[in-house]
């Protein structure tokens, strides 16, 4: 069996990546360590994407590991600067020099902390022990952690989290809106004004009347609700094209038009008359 070592690719030296994939069994201990040095609390609902969720009975490492740790971080509880200060304090307590701590663009990528956009990346000892190697932790800051939990869900064996994000965007475009993974549903006709950031509001706007957050959790649940929509094929067309290029099979619509129903009745009647 080949064990994949690659994970997040922020931290690297001239010799190669400084981080690796993390086994699902090591995720909890690693997050416990992060909580200890930062004072933050990350419940499982704040483990974004596939973090800690991949379990496959065949035992293959890739199917039982995550490339990095994605953590839903509430910007109202801690700022990026405060988090960096806490991480820096711990690193210094381990004898790491100031100059070695921060990545500096492309000039220095072998540091321990990388500050970029809405995220802080940290080269984290797996289960708190450097002997286990390191995994990249992505602290993903947001002003709306409830929305981000739903925006950055993992996937299923058939359709991953990226596939789900593409489907959300495809449906939103079909409804004359845009899906922002940071803000929610926005209206391009109103200067990208946010029109919904709660998933129980987003669900019916995208999938139709009666849809709830639970219907948006996976590609499969979204398609199951949406495929009765008369505009199903049009709504998923961009997503479907992307999936077919990736060799993934997409369910057909189950919507039955009036013409379809009439044709079905004629066929049924004809078969009865023949008998």
Predicted feature residues:
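Active-site nucleotide-donor binding segment shared across nucleotidyl transfer reactions
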Residues: 31-81
